[in-house]
């Protein structure tokens, strides 16, 4: 997980990031290979997924997942490291990305737009 932000409805957004390898992708398409791997290779040498599919999860304070958005192709928004809800949209960014993503959130508060919305008014 990387970066947690508040949503306009009082819940939270979480960015997930990592990198995926061609060897892992190949192993996931070969069940026999995976079976042999877990029988013959020590666990600390197994292939693990480090998925670079951009993903953002919305969840409650209790940890219940309410929504998830991700880029299955890992082409548009790989390795998302940040997100911020602003005026009815969820903006996505990543350290290695050359673009900013924007997802419309139909149920979001369209007035949620400043530090006062996010943190509350200054005392």
Residue map of PLM features:
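Sequence-structural signature of mature extracellular/luminal beta-sheet repeat domains
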Residues: 1-123
């Amino acid at each position: 997980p990387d970066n947690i932000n508040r949503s306009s409805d009082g819940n939270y957004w979480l960015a997930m990031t990592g990198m995926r390898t061609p060897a892992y992708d190949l192993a996931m398409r070969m069940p026999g290979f995976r079976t042999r791997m877990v029988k013959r290779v020590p666990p600390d040498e197994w292939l693990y997924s480090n998925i670079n599919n951009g993903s953002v999860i919305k969840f409650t304070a209790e940890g219940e997942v309410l929504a998830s958005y991700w880029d299955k192709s890992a082409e548009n928004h790989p390795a998302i490291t940040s997100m911020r809800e602003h005026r009815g949209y969820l903006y996505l960014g990543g350290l290695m990305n050359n673009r900013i993503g924007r997802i419309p959130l139909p149920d979001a508060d369209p007035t949620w737009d400043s530090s006062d919305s996010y943190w509350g008014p200054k005392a």
